[in-house]
Amino acid sequence: MEEDIDTRKINSSFLRDHSYATEADIISTVEFNSTGELLATGDKGGRVVIFQREQENKNQPHRRGEYNVYSTFQSHEPEFDYLKSLEIEEKINKIRWLPQQNAAYFLLSTNDKTVKLWKVSERDKRPEGYNLKDEDGRIRDPCTITSLRVPVLRPMDLMVEATPRRVFSNAHTYHINSISVNSDYETYMSADDLRINLWNLEITNRSFNIVDIKPTNMEELTEVITAAEFHPHNCNTFVYSSSKGTIRLCDMRSSALCDRHSKLFEEPEDPSNRSFFSEIISSISDVKFNHSGRYIMTRDYLTVKVWDLNMENRPIETYQVHDYLRSKLCSLYENDCIFDKFECVWNGSDSVIMTGSYNNFFRMFDRNTKRDVTLEASRENSKPRAILKPRKVCVGGKRRKDEISVDSLDFSKKILHTAWHPSENIIAVAATNNLYIFQDKVN
């Protein structure tokens, strides 16, 4: 980034508002497409909302970074598994875009059990002048047809349609936590707590199990899969993380079932920091390759770590996200916040890392300058095109006017899901049921 991260002026824009929010309105995933022109969000009500970026306007250059609603559709419905007497939530766990091949857009969305491939396309013309149908679509009496008509296309108001093209189901016993599109653009993988499956985008009735960590005796279970992602360039390589804080790199060329990893990334635990909560806070909630595929970023409860693929024994960078919460782990355990799963993202050049925290705070770390900043996504501070001010958390002692005490943080306001535009300094931040777009200020 051209300027120091803590001195940059950041514009904000407030997109999605539900004054009377219900559980179904809570945003559960955020994802830009490969060009950054579209931004998709999924929520706990099973809906997908797609936003489209404003086109360039010389008269209003500041509107270029704004996103407006492009399409809204119901992706998943609540279901009931009668064999196991379990409700299957409609909540969208993940959205992943496929690279654009033509005028239409394609995306994968998943809830706990079922992945769907959606086609989002535009229509601004409609056919008229059928021989066997009238203009309302009713079948005409063949006896009344006296002339042959050539159907024509007439202009109509632009309509955006979302249609399900594939439904990939019945392959996961446990809850799906990740989907990742392969760099061959023909396959993708879906991961649940104990297994990872490989799918062909054209075939819905068959998948290949590539990782299975389920023990013969479930009482021997010591860890679960928490996230998985394909390498951005090598279609045979992928990583998955676990609740024990380990990351495994697997190569599908070595064997069809990748139960034996090629590399294991794990940081030795510091005995002086050992506590009752050590195993819980070391669980990895997100794993991401950088754009070159040389580095992996992981997020656990208190830190973000960057790993070099060539060095397995420790991360090359560790960033403290909210270390001031270390003294609060007991109360965070009691209110279940310690199990929150925060995501992390790279910027387009891999020089800055972003991840969320509590009190609607989100953190940015500049890898080059080692500077970091805490910003807040809230309606009070984020009027459209307002400049965000850095926030600081005070742990103890005297508190300055611009600081907030760690004891007054609101743990019900949390930023779990964030996304970064693939090439520009535009970010999307989901704060419970509200979506914020922030961008570098254009002078």
UniProtKB/Swiss-Prot annotation:
The lineage of its organism: Eukaryota, Metazoa, Chordata, Craniata, Vertebrata. It is found in: Cytoplasm; Cytoplasm, Cytoskeleton; Membrane. PROSITE patterns: PR55_1 (PS01024), PR55_2 (PS01025), WD_REPEATS_1 (PS00678). PP2A consists of a common heterodimeric core enzyme, composed of a 36 kDa catalytic subunit (subunit C) and a 65 kDa constant regulatory subunit (PR65 or subunit A), that associates with a variety of regulatory subunits. Keywords: Cytoplasm, Cytoskeleton, Membrane, Repeat, WD repeat. The gene is ppp2r2b. This is Serine/threonine-protein phosphatase 2A 55 kDa regulatory subunit B beta isoform. Coiled coil: none annotated. GO terms for cellular component: cytoplasm; cytoskeleton; membrane; protein phosphatase type 2A complex. The B regulatory subunit might modulate substrate selectivity and catalytic activity, and might also direct the localization of the catalytic enzyme to a particular subcellular compartment. Negatively controls the initiation of oocyte maturation. It comes from Xenopus tropicalis. WD repeats lie at residues 22-61, 87-128, 171-209, 220-260, 279-317, 334-375, 410-443. InterPro entries: PP2A_PR55, PP2A_PR55_CS, WD40/YVTN_repeat-like_dom_sf, WD40_repeat_dom_sf, WD40_rpt. GO terms for molecular function: protein phosphatase regulator activity. Belongs to the phosphatase 2A regulatory subunit B family.
